[in-house]
Amino acid sequence: MNDSLLSNGHAPPLRQATVDRQTKETKVHVELTLDGNGLADNHTGIPFLNHMLDQLCAHGLVDLRVQASGDTHIDDHHTNEDVGITLGMALDQALGDRRGIQRFGHFVAPLDESLVEVALDFSGRPHLNYGLQIPTQRVGTYDTQLVREFFVALVNHSRMTLHIRQLDGMNSHHIIEATFKAFARALRMAIALDPRRAQQIPSSKGVIQA
């Protein structure tokens, strides 16, 4: 059986979403295609965040376009958080009722001396267990506290449970990049369509909600 086909022999609908979000602090536009090829066009005004989003595309095989502007003359906090919010909203919309997905994902990614484990569940119940110990306050101009803020925003608006655990690492850039790579691969597993499940909701309750 072709894994890309439903039980009725038809291809599944394209899973994608476009979300625009604007506040007095930021303006964010996100286009997301889950069944993509890793295409990335990310311009957030925060170079390091662009780099991490590119990793998400390359290793999660999602297509992602993010255009963001904000009050980065103050600091990166609002833009970083609002990109996470808008991406989470797009992910939630693209997944719909979660029908037919694997739902769970888990991956351990090494990057030189760093090793990060990520497990996630599209449970409908937002929860983040964040276990990174990043040794420096900044990577270039990027405030490393914003890594957690990005994932908090993403988790809350995609309605996922996410565990991030640092198993090893000393270099801040390596730790963060390993995190995004592990997240990307876990995401790729979780959003994959399960041909054995066809169009069923992946829950014994028959519904996934908060």
Curated annotation (Swiss-Prot):
Functional pathway: Amino-acid biosynthesis; L-histidine biosynthesis; L-histidine from 5-phospho-alpha-D-ribose 1-diphosphate: step 6/9
Localization, UniProt: Cytoplasm
Any one GO BP annotation for this protein: L-histidine biosynthetic process
Classification via InterPro entries: IGPD_sf, ImidazoleglycerolP_deHydtase, ImidazoleglycerP_deHydtase_CS, Ribosomal_Su5_D2-typ_SF
Pfam families (UniProt xref): IGPD
UniProt entry keywords in alphabetical sequence: Amino-acid biosynthesis, Cytoplasm, Histidine biosynthesis, Lyase
Reaction(s) this enzyme catalyzes, per UniProt: D-erythro-1-(imidazol-4-yl)glycerol 3-phosphate = 3-(imidazol-4-yl)-2-oxopropyl phosphate + H2O
EC number: 4.2.1.19
Keyword Cytoplasm (UniProt): yes
UniProt xrefs under CDD domains: IGPD
SUPFAM superfamilies linked to this entry: Ribosomal protein S5 domain 2-like
GO CC terms of this entry: cytoplasm
Molecular-function GO term, any one: imidazoleglycerol-phosphate dehydratase activity
Residue segments, region Disordered: 1-23
Family as reported in the entry's similarity comment: Belongs to the imidazoleglycerol-phosphate dehydratase family.
PANTHER family reported for this sequence: IMIDAZOLEGLYCEROL-PHOSPHATE DEHYDRATASE, IMIDAZOLEGLYCEROL-PHOSPHATE DEHYDRATASE HIS7
Listed name of the protein: Imidazoleglycerol-phosphate dehydratase
Originating species: Thermosynechococcus vestitus (strain NIES-2133 / IAM M-273 / BP-1)
Primary gene name: hisB
